[in-house]
Every structure is written in C-alpha cells, then in structure tokens.
Amino acid sequence: MVYKYDFLVIGAGVAGMSYALKVAREKKGTVCIICKAGLDEANTSFAQGGVASVTNLELDNFDKHIEDTMIAGDFISDRAAVEQVVRNAPAQIQEMVEWGVNFDRKDDGKFDLHREGGHSEFRILHHADDTGAEIQRGLMEAIRNNPDIEVKENHFAVEIITQHHLGVRVTRRSPNIQCYGAYVLNPITEKVDTYLSKVTVMCTGGCGAVYLTTSNPVIATGDGIAMVYRAKGTVADMEFVQFHPTVLHNPKETHPAYLITEAMRGYGGILKLPNGETFMEKYDERLSLAPRDIVARAIDKEMKIHGLDHVCLDVTHKDPAETKHHFPNIYQKCLSIGIDITTDYIPVRPAAHYMCGGIKVDLNGQTSIERLYALGECSCTGLHGGNRLASNSLIEAVVYADAAAKDSLQHVDLYDWNDKVPEWNDEGTMTNEEKVLITQSVREVNQIMSNYVGIVRSDLRLHRAWDRLDMLYEETERLFKRVKASRDICELRNMINVGYLITRWALERKECRGLHFTTDYPLHAYDK
C-alpha cells in the first residue's frame, strides 16, 4: 500500500505534535503523524520537572539562562543553538498556553516558577509534578480536534527512504542524499507500507531502553537515530548519556523505572548503603546535594565496590506528615510495594535518563539528509553540549519545532513525491517463530550497555562492548533478512545500532567531559 502526504511526522511527543500543529494551521498540505504506540505514550508524558524559560524579567534575563546552559554543557554547547532556544522560549510558552496547556500560577496570575539544579534563578514553569503529562494532554487534545492532521497510532517506521532504495549507491560522503518518506509497519495487516512525503520529520525520542534500567518507557529504543544513521545521515555527541541518580529500585519496573525526584535530596534525604553507612562524603563536600552526574557516579561506584544492586535514600529523620505532604505520589508509590518512606529506607539506583546527542541538525532542525528534519531528544542541536541543564529539553523541542515548521513551509512547494520508490519487498521471507532469539538479544544489549558503557567507562569495557555488539549485529542482520519485518526485530536492530554509536563515540573521546567519565583519561580538557 502506498500513501502520500506533504508532511510526514514520525513520533508523537511534544516535538512531533507541536510541529504538526504549526504546519497544519498554514493549510499548505496534508499532515500525518506516525506513532509507534498510543498517542499518550510518548516520552514527553514521563517528564516530571518542567519547562525552562525566562518569564520574570525583573529577576531573570536571557544572558543568565544562556550562561547556566553553557556551564551545564561543560562549555561545548553550540552557543548559537543556546541563544536560539533561550531567546525564543517565551513565545513558545505562550503558544503552548494557547493550545490548552496549563502551567501552575500564583494567586496574582503570574507563573509559579520553580528553580532546579544548575539554574541561577527561578524560571521553571510546571504543572504540579507531572508537567510532561500535562503538555502531552494539551497537545493531544489540539491534535485530535484538528481535522487537517491524520494520526496513525501503533504504526512503526522501519526505514526512511532515500536514493539507496532506488538502486543508487549511497555512502556517508554522498552529496545531496534525499529523504522521500518512510517504510511503515501496519500492525493490523502486518505489512510494511510505503509512505511518500515531501518533507519528513523525525521526532522519535530517546534511547534509554538500551540500558537495563531507565526512566524512559519501553518504546525508547532509539529508532530515529538508528534509521538516520543507517541512511548515512550524520549523528553527533552520542557519548553523552545522562543518568538520573535515583530511580526506585524495583526489578518489576525497569522500563520505565519510577523517578525519585532530586527534590527529595533537597528536602533533606541522605544517601546511604543498606547497612545505614553514609558514603557521599568520599566524593563531594556537598554530600547528597552534589550535582546529578557526581551523585550518579558515586552510587555506581559504591554498588560495584559492595556488589549491590541498589543503595538507599533515607528520609526517616524528617517529619512524617511533612514528607507525605511534599511527596504524596512517591509516598503512595513506595507504599504500593511495601515501603513506608517515613520509617523505611527507599531503595534507589541510577538509570539512563536522557540522550544529549543524536541526529545532527542545524538551527532549522534540518539534518544532513535533504527534506529530513529531526526534533526533540532524537536530535542533536548542540544545546546540551556535554550535559543537559534541567528542564531545557521540552523547550528545545518546541523552539526547534517552530524553526523547522517555518523552514519546511518555505520549501515544501519545491518538492514532489518520488513515484519511482519501490514498495517494501519481503518475498522469500518467513514469519519468525524463534522469538526467543530476539528477547535474548535484547537482554544481552541491556547487559552490555549497562555493564560496559554506563556511568563510568574504561577502554577495556568499551572494547568488550564493541566486540559483543558486533557479534549481535551480525546475528540480527542475518535474522532480519530471513524473516518478515516485525516491531520487535526492528527495535532490536535499532538498539544495537544506537549501542554501537554510544560505544564508538565514547571510545573516541579521550578525556572526562560532561557526562562522559572514563578511568583511562581522568583529566578534564582544562586540566591537561
């Protein structure tokens, strides 16, 4: 089956939906959103924190937000990208409000602003402790009420279409690679359909699911990054994987693991070993209030030293009523698995949280492949550099969605559908009856990435990961050519590709910088 759209959006988080709304209102063509799960299951929904934007000019200004972002990124952020996001943020906040997103306000009607780690001022807009879910709700409502946007839920993009599919040899040095759309798996027919487009936008989110434990949903398998890499597009900064230091240790919930907010440490929570011994004094004078990456590395090291699968966060010394008031959701969540946080330690461990790198884009969100844009966590704008500043990701998504919408609307009339694109050919393949091969390989990828390419790295571990991933790659490609395309084998391919990219970029950075910490090159660039 062949479908034709002017704008094809792959992914339905804040980036994909805001882009779709922006192009649809201009009435310049048909818009389709491909969503691998339900519309409400995007990673955006899991964002607890908020949206960073300068809204109180009496106390804050753009220069402060820019400087905070550069410091957090270890001074390898692209300053032009930082300026673009910070200076355009207020206008995009206003547009989200117009779409129906509710941010908490004070009695005087002004935004109730929070302050998070790394920010010098109060500038975080939020909706209670579920900002991402509120943004997703507001945008979903706007999407469903827009007759000009078609949504294909539970459809899976398998590959983007380029000249390669027309029989042309395409390499990473090939000039003018063009994207003509995507091959998409229909879950009802179990067939791969051809979606031709004039403009394609990749908004597939992050890749936390390549690790054993992640705050991301199970669908965060790095699909967009892998597809663009296979199509010979440019990726960047893949070594910078942000780990949240404290998720609830619950072997039954790993994708996503339940976040234990950093506000709990700000409230007075103390990190301890299960025997009650404190350990943060060995790593930082700020103890449990040290920055996220330092705390994550400290916990990781203590777990490895003592052979533990978790450490503990202790708030039992705080007033029980106050704890329940400040953290009602965490209290109820822990209680549901038999832990009363007013009397018991909370078992916590680090988890993969955010990919700072991804598909390299310019200030318009344009990738190295013509007619293809990338937005949100799957993209690498240069904003985050070596480490993401808290709450900068959601605003990055909408600012770049706006830039990409404006740029693509100017160019869409120059393009046409390429009717020479062949339909997906799976002749000679068979239905895979050996699902155990896929599930076992997924477990192996998770183990490899967590043990060898995690928070603390070494060349020995990275080379071992490279070798193991290479073997899995060969096995999986042979299987992929033999069986009909399915979501599980496509996700496995993507996970292996992304795991390889993280490993390769980590091997190439011979220093400790941002989120990349290696025992073989302990000096920071500034210390050399």
Where are these regions (language model features)?
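An anion/pyrophosphate-binding glycine-rich loop and adjacent beta-alpha core
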Residues: M227, G233-I341, I346, V398, ...
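Conserved redox-cofactor binding core of oxidoreductases
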Residues: V97-K191, C203, V247-P251
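Short beta-strand to alpha-helix junction loop
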Residues: S77-P90, R123-E141, K152, T214-G222, ...
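Conserved N-terminal glycine-rich FAD pyrophosphate-binding loop of Rossmann-like flavoproteins
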Residues: A37-D68, D74, Q242-T246, H255-P256
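Glycine-rich Rossmann-fold phosphate-binding loop(s) that bind the pyrophosphate
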Residues: A12-V14
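Glycine- and aromatic-enriched mobile tails/lids
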Residues: M1-D6, Y19-K22, G29, G38-D40, ...
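Short hydrophobic core segments
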Residues: L8-I10, Y195-T204
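Short beta-strand "acidic-cap" motif of Rossmann-like dinucleotide-binding folds
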Residues: G29-C35, D237
